[in-house]
Amino acid sequence: MNKEEILKYVGFDLDKAKQIYAWLHADCEQAPTPSLPNEVVSIVEQDGKKLVRVDVGNKYHFGIDLHDAPNEMNWDDAKKYAEDKGMRLFTLEEGLLMFCFKDEINAKLKEAGGDELREDDYYWSSTEYSRTNARLVHFINGTATINLKSYGYVVRPVAAFTCVS
């Protein structure tokens, strides 16, 4: 999938997003003031933690941890690792958006003192496929695949954002 196909897959309407973007962030002090589509990624602090924030349209707002987990882990351990940090695994759609904006995300991760997303590994998503399988995202080409939850893969937690006026 290319960037446009992924944005369409996750239901992102660029024209509509441009129209509602100002409204979306009107009451959110932390929100960046980008002009879509090029500046949807920013560095923010939430709960004393520096994150790379991604804002796409009116549906996807999340912060990416600056670092991967120290080791690859199975899906259950990956979920627990993220939860112990007060975060979660990204959804499949969020992972695909991370692929779409990986250059911008990696630049901000580096600027914030974090580690770039690896292109040579698969990352766990929170999206389950079955009782024994979950979805993964590969950041070199945006591949979304399925594998056993018992296998070890890379983990990059994310946090949800809410605007408080």
Model-derived features with residue positions:
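The identity of the second residue at the extreme N-terminus of proteins
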Residues: M1-N2, S165
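Extracellular adhesion/carbohydrate-recognition regions
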Residues: K3-M87, D121, N133, V154-V158
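An exposed tryptophan-centered "aromatic clamp" motif
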Residues: W75-R88, L92-Y151, V158-F161, S165
